[in-house]
Amino acid sequence: MTKRLILASQSPRRKELLNLLQIPYSIIASRTEEKLNRNLSPEENVQCLAEQKAGAVLAENPDAVVIGADTMVCIDGECLGKPHDREEAAHMLRRLSGRSHQVITAVSIQTHDRKETFCDTTEVTFWPLSEDDIQLYIETKEPMDKAGAYGIQGKGALLVKKIDGDFYSVVGLPVAKTMRALKEFNIKA
C-alpha cells in the first residue's frame, strides 16, 4: 500500500516543483522555528532544518511519508537568510553583485521507521549590479521572502550571469534527486 505523501512547506515554489512529479500529495506547513547553530557548517545547518521540518509534521502524521526542505544562500562562509527589510535586501544584493555564491538545498524524506536526507549545492554567479539595478529589483518586492534576497525563477533571473548545478535546487527543491529518493519509499512519479 502506498503511503500518503506530505510536503512540510508553505513555499509556493516547492509546491510548483513537486507538482512536476505528478504524484498526489498534501501540504502541511511545519511550524518549527528556524534557528542556525553556529557550531555547524552551512550544509549541516540546512540538513538539520530540513529534518526538523519533516520530523515535526511526521510526529502529527505517523503513517505518512513527509518531505521537508530548506534552502540557504552562502557567500564567504556566511549564510544569508530572508531579508527583514529593504535595506537588508539591498545589503545582501550588494554582497552578491559580480560574485559567485553557493545555494544549498537540503531535502529530508521521513517515515516512522526511515529517514533519508541529502544536500545539493549549486554555484550561482551574479552580474555586477548598479545601485539602480538593486533598487529596481527591490521595488518588485520579490527579494523580501527569499533567502539571499533573490528569486532565480522570477525577475531575479536577470541578475544571474551563470549557474553551475541544479537550477531547481536554487528554486528550492532538487526535483530529480527528490524523485529518485521518493522511489526508495515506494512513491513513484
Swiss-Prot record:
It is found in: Cytoplasm. Its cofactor is a divalent metal cation. This is dTTP/UTP pyrophosphatase. The active site is at 70 (proton acceptor). Keywords: Cytoplasm, Hydrolase, Nucleotide metabolism. The gene is maf. Nucleoside triphosphate pyrophosphatase that hydrolyzes dTTP and UTP. May have a dual role in cell division arrest and in preventing the incorporation of modified nucleotides into cellular nucleic acids. It comes from Bacillus velezensis (strain DSM 23117 / BGSC 10A6 / LMG 26770 / FZB42) (Bacillus amyloliquefaciens subsp. plantarum). Its EC number is 3.6.1.9. One of its GO terms (molecular function) is dTTP diphosphatase activity. The keyword Hydrolase applies.
